[in-house]
């Protein structure tokens, strides 16, 4: 590659990183949070629910839900799983309105205290247009990955080490290149699946009206393979045995892992029951993998599956489990892959943060005004978001359950994040302010883990979900370590070695 082409790739990588880096950090951090949140449902429950106990029959829990006012005619029952031992009852739109303790049938508090950051990642609180906007950042990440690989192609021989003793700037450059090169497969996975998740949905919505003029909903029915409509048959004589139906399905398809039971026309003689889940070796979700049964006698009627469908449709279906680390179809290795997926999400956030830092330091030396503007945005938006997430976790675990408390927690999140942004725009020493934010965030995450562990020991007599507590404490310690003021000699600008061109 000639010098002019290399210079253009450098300019693209630096310019795109500076222009989009702050928003990209928000997308990456909120995405990593979303992944962790899905595995922390049980962490938000009362600790006693996670203790192994005999469970009530599913029919008894369904009757309990009906007594509490849940409409079961067309409902979705999310079965207990290791990361959330509760059984949840949701409507046809999959909005869950009730959670029960499967051992006692007692109602459980909502676990949606941290969904504000999940919604931030999925839609930016803007509905479907926000989902499309977020997916565009997958394309931005892909462009940055390609440009970074071209820029650092000579760094492959040194990609296994991070040099020390050459100053903070060189160490951060090496860390940035190390994450980018070794984490490239995961970064491409995040970017590609993230872009397809939103843009694929946009294409489906746009083409549905063309494929089925006047009846666009038929496109979604064909995509999902929903059960055929049935006529009303009057009230049934007795309710079916759902546990027996689950056992029958397990005997028929032993490689299938049930996740939900979907009720259609419950209470009618022609009621149908779908068992949704995932199959071993098939990258799909419970939305597309379903077994249909007649409720009254348990007769199997049909299977809906992505297996055997067109290549592009199967690729589109596989996007969600790959993007959100839903590796249940992998088997025993699924948990390890999910942890690795999460760690690479954190690494992607560090990649973005180090890139922003290097660009700001390079431009701040000649007192470039754009560097000061970007520094204020990066410190306030990125550092403030990390702190707001920690405050949300700590306060959410320390405060009692209640609707008013949930509302106050949402206000706390926005107040902390907004306050961090406002102060970052006003303070003169933004590096010192960033260290303050990181110290506060580190303390918040560590206290969140310690608080839950203490509550678990008091309420259940054992440290349930201790790996999550340990991860929170470790992340808090990492933030506290990173917030330490660097030594004066480490802050001196070192000469960048050959092949380590600064941003």
Locate predicted features.
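Conserved histidines in hydrophobic membrane contexts and catalytic metal-binding motifs
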Residues: 1-503
């Amino acid at each position: 590659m000639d010098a002019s082409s290399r210079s253009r790739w450098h300019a693209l990588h630096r310019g795109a990183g500076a222009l989009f880096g702050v928003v990209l950090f928000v997308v990456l951090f909120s995405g990593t949070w979303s992944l962790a949140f899905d595995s922390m449902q049980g962490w938000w429950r009362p600790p006693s629910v996670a203790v192994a106990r005999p469970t009530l029959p599913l029919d008894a829990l369904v009757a309990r839900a009906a007594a509490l006012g849940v409409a079961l005619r067309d409902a979705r029952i999310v079965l207990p799983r290791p990361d959330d031992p509760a059984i949840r009852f949701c409507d046809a739109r999959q909005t869950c309105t009730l959670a029960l303790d499967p051992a006692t049938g007692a109602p459980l508090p909502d676990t949606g205290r941290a969904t504000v950051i999940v919604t931030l990642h999925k839609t930016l609180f803007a509905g479907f247009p926000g989902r499309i906007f977020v997916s565009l950042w997958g394309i931005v990440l892909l462009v940055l990955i390609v440009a970074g690989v071209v820029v650092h192609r000579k760094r492959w021989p040194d990609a296994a080490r991070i040099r020390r003793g050459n100053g903070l700037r060189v160490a951060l450059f090496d860390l940035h290149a190390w994450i980018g090169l070794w984490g490239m497969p995961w970064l491409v996975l995040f970017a590609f699946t993230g872009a397809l998740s939103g843009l694929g949905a946009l294409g489906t919505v746009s083409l549905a009206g063309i494929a089925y003029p006047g009846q666009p909903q038929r496109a979604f029915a064909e995509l999902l393979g929903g059960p055929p409509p049935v006529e009303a048959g009057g009230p049934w004589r007795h309710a079916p045995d759902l546990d027996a139906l689950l056992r029958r399905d397990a005997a028929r398809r032993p490689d299938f892992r049930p996740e939900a039971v979907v009720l259609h026309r419950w209470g009618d003689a022609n009621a149908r029951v779908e068992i949704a889940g995932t199959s071993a070796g098939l990258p799909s979700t419970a939305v597309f993998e379903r077994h249909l049964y007649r409720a009254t006698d348990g007769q199997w009627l049909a299977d809906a599956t992505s297996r055997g469908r067109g290549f592009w449709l199967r690729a589109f279906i596989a996007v969600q489990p790959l993007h959100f680390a839903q590796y249940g179809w992998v088997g025993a290795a699924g948990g390890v892959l999910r942890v690795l997926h999460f760690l690479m999400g954190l690494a992607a956030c560090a990649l973005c943060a180090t890139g922003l830092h290097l660009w700001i330091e390079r431009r701040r030396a000649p007192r470039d005004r754009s560097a000061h503007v970007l520094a204020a945005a990066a410190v306030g938006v990125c550092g403030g978001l990390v702190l707001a997430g920690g405050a949300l976790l700590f306060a959410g675990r320390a405060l009692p359950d209640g609707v008013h408390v949930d509302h106050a927690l949402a206000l706390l999140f926005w107040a902390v994040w907004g306050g961090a942004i406002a102060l970052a725009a006003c303070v003169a020493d933004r590096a010192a302010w960033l260290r303050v934010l990181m110290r506060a965030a580190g303390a918040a995450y560590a206290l969140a883990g310690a608080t839950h562990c203490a509550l678990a020991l008091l309420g259940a007599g054992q440290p349930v979900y201790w790996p999550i507590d340990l991860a929170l404490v470790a992340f808090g310690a990492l933030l506290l370590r990173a917030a330490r003021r660097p030594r004066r000699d480490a802050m001196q600008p070192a000469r960048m070695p050959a092949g380590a061109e600064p941003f």
